[in-house]
Amino acid sequence: MKTYRNFVNGQYVDASDGKTIPVVDPTTGEQYATAPNSGAADVDAAMKAAADAFETWRDSTPKDRSLALFRIADAIEARGEEFIALESENCGKPVGITRSEEIPPMV
């Protein structure tokens, strides 16, 4: 069974209290993973990390921001099939719809 974690400040972390919730495939009703059951303290930590990161982003040049966004797009494209499978499983969408309507527009 898969175990998902929060991604905060460049690191994968569990909920601060260690609690998890089941992740269920909506097409079968079967649990296929667990995810952190994040609370207010987890949200506050993520918000602080995002605000701190924004300082660097805000002060970067448009060229640097553009290059960073292109690198993100390249990474999404390189792992496209993985994202398609995850999104289909998470939402219960057919893979074909996810492949044509969800992931490509992100890139």
Question: Where are the predicted features?
Answer:
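Glycine-rich loop-to-alpha-helix module at the N-terminal edge of alpha/beta enzyme cores
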Residues: 32-107
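Terminal low-complexity tails and localization/encapsulation signals of metabolic enzymes
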Residues: 1-34, 67, 71
